[in-house]
Amino acid sequence: MAKITQTMISQLLAAVGGSSNVSKCGNCMTRLRLTLANNGVADQAVIKQIPGVMGVVESDEQFQIILGPGKAQQAAELMNKLIESVINGDVQEQAMASDTNDLSSVAAEQKKQMKSKQTSAVQRFLSKFATIFTPLIPGFIAAGLLLGFATLLEQMFVLEQTPSQFILDLIAYMKVFGKGLFAFLSILIGYNAQQAFGGSGVNGAILASLFVLGYNPDATSGIYSGMSEFFGYTIDPRGNIIGVLLAAIIGAQVERKVREYMPDDLDMILTSVVTLLIMGVVTFVVIMPIGGELFKGMSWLFLNLNDNPLGAAILAGLFLISVVFGIHQGFVPVYFALMEAQGFNSLFPILAMAGGGQVGASLALYFKAKKDAVLRTQVKGAIIPGILGIGEPLIYGVTLPRVKPFVTACIGGAAGGFFIGLVSYLGLPVGLNTVFGPSGIVAIPLMTSHSGIFAGMAVFVVGLLISYVVGFLATYFFGSKDVDLS
């Protein structure tokens, strides 16, 4: 696979319209995420021809370039440095612009095409979830892995024998990071959410803290807020992540509106004060009760879907499509709801089956292709990340461009999801021990169940194998016909 080089980044920057068209440059695990002043200027055809680019996803405010695992962050750093150099006059963009086939001449045509495929309001909304949750994913994974290893040590050395004090201390040490993360996670999410929707992150963090504080003066745990009611109104901090998101999103809109009317000289002093006073009332009186009911309803819906083999198959089968559109982060609030309802995330292993179907489909294409085919090289470069749980290189480099294998990959994922749902229906739901984590084989030590981690790990592995096999067979016999295998 192509390396991230200065030349490649220069070509990408030119193809999206130059530094003047890039308002913000960031990344997630596999994608370079750009906020462009004018999406119509970006030449997708040119971008897709640049070596190392696996695909392009446009989601209203974000223009996403898929580069693969381990490359997106490097690309974002190089592009930000290049943009800064251009702004400072250290680098001229003239040389870069020559590679774009006169972007200004095609901008008008591109703009017309973009207007014809406007994204939906739902897609625009869900795309912001990547901005909120992507920075938190490394912490979720780290806390989940440490908790998984701690639980494994517990089951091996604590439950059936007298452990040493060192083992007990080690287990407690590995668990403390997860407890710290989940104790204050709402505040981190509130900060990111309000910032993502155009407000000040610190105001979102303060609003989120209202859900963390305690309102019972007699409670023996937590941090007492100093108030047990709000002007005679009983405070019930329900809603969890749903309430926090609602408060931050609405808070961002209120803050922006207040700033419109606030004199510039008073903006820094009073805008946040007025915003918090307004949003405190809204949060205590409206958001907490409504958020609580929404949270309860979401938990009920997905608990029933996860315990139903058909529902689980549908969720797993459609998940790859949500990845293609870049809206898969929209499931994260559901993960929180399930963590609170079950003690683990039972949706994640179902959705992870989609990656298994992708691996099976890609292996089938590998064996169908001739020994000197470029397709084999593409599969070789992307199969290991796919097995480890990062499926975008396989999606954009192997299956999606050929369409049929993408469909059969979805079928493979659905088969694995059906198995996970069936086992849950029979009385053994399994799930991730943290909100979010890696999929693929890396997720095995993070699996758990009410019958222990070994049962959870075993069910997940069998489901993954089913996805591999069904994805392989469906693609080998049906998904590779009339498909470019060169």
Curated annotation (Swiss-Prot):
Reply yes or no: does the keyword Transmembrane helix apply: yes
Q: Which GO terms describe its molecular function?
A: kinase activity; protein-N(PI)-phosphohistidine-sugar phosphotransferase activity; protein-phosphocysteine-N-acetylmuramate phosphotransferase system transporter activity
Q: What residue stretches are annotated with the PTS EIIC type-1 domain?
A: 127-486
**Membrane topology recorded in Swiss-Prot or TrEMBL:** Multi-pass membrane protein
Span of domain PTS EIIB type-1: 1-89
Membrane spanning segments where? 129-149, 170-190, 196-216, 230-250, 268-288, 312-332, 347-367, 381-401, 411-431, 453-473
Reaction it catalyzes:
N-acetyl-beta-D-muramate(out) + N(pros)-phospho-L-histidyl-[protein] = N-acetyl-beta-D-muramate 6-phosphate(in) + L-histidyl-[protein]
Q: Which GO terms describe its biological process?
A: phosphoenolpyruvate-dependent sugar phosphotransferase system
Instruction: Locate the active site.
Output: C28 (phosphocysteine intermediate)
Task: Quote the CDD domains the UniProt record gives.
Answer: PTS_IIB_glc (cd00212)
State the UniProt keywords alphabetically. Cell inner membrane, Cell membrane, Kinase, Membrane, Phosphotransferase system, Sugar transport, Transferase, Transmembrane, Transmembrane helix, Transport
Enzyme Commission designation: 2.7.1.192
Could you give the domain comment from the record?
The EIIB domain is phosphorylated by phospho-EIIA on a cysteinyl or histidyl residue, depending on the transported sugar. Then, it transfers the phosphoryl group to the sugar substrate concomitantly with the sugar uptake processed by the EIIC domain. The EIIC domain forms the PTS system translocation channel and contains the specific substrate-binding site.
User: What is the name of the protein in this document?
Assistant: PTS system N-acetylmuramic acid-specific EIIBC component
* Species the sequence originates in: Vibrio vulnificus (strain YJ016)
Encoding gene, per UniProt annotation: murP
